[in-house]
Amino acid sequence: MIDLRSDTLTQPTPAMREAIANAAVGDEQKREDPTVNELERRGAEFLGHEEAVFLPTATMANQIALQILGRPGDALLVERHAHIMLSELGGPAAHSGLLTIGLEGTKGRFSPDQVVSEIRDRTSVHVAPTRIVAVENTHNSAGGRVWPLEEIDAIVATCREHELAVHLDGARLVNAAVACGVPAARIGGGFDTVTLCFSKALGCPLGALIAGSHELMQSARRGKHFFGGAMRQAGIVAAAALYALDHHVDRIADDHARARRLAEGLTEAGVDVDLEQVETNFVQIDVGPDRAGAIDRMKEHGVLVSTTVHPTVVRAVTHLDVSDDDIETAIAAIPEAVTRTGAPAGR
């Protein structure tokens, strides 16, 4: 079975498992785990910040970032299909008392003018003052779309001008960095806080980082305990993340190339794929109104895909465990599954 549902499905490689088995460990809560300490040091440098904190998940990292950047009653601006908005169970409100305002995005992005238009008077006793702006890069629901560097810089500059905190949900930041041909620090370094997930393109079983200034990360360590993210001998997990930073970043270009090959092959076969959308490792396929039937037929042909926020669209995501041969098999199988469910044969 070729599993293209998500890049969260990767399995640790044999070499990563060896690194896990051989990890030096200590009490992470006492800052005595040497492997965690090394990951936090290197992770901060990788993300362009003074300090980083190791956490179990990127969702926890996002929620800690929002908690330390705002206060109850503040307003948070995000693109309306962002992970923070749709897939974190109302966390900004539940955990931090934040009012989340969704901006209408294009390809998962929004403009400085949109930010400025939503800035609320902090002196008013009637409104929630705008305090935080969050960017997601790459953008999951938009299909792995990448923010251009100049747009990132413009958003950060606007936030600085208007004294707004700015957070980067960088769950797939490494995909954006590889697509732009720049270090991750070039994208994430200008934000107040940035998160990175290790269990997607980097192929780890779990783990995430939040990075920022020393002062903010001191607050993040308190947030780590508050959210139940403090661990003990966490070096066995941090070792996987260190291995990934050494061995799995550059190879992400292979995932992107395979996604492009899949999209082009399906387009040649008459399947409705938006080629312009394929910027990283996501391919969005319009299968028509019988999406459930198309997914079932693809499974019968040995290919697993997942749904998206769009009712006629499925996604295929390339990752560490998808080979060139898998892509060619999928190119042969998917058109048969789509046409047999009556989907359109391309735009």
Task: Report residues per predicted region.
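Conserved PLP-enzyme active-site core in the AAT-like
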Residues: 1-288, 292-301, 306-322, 330-347
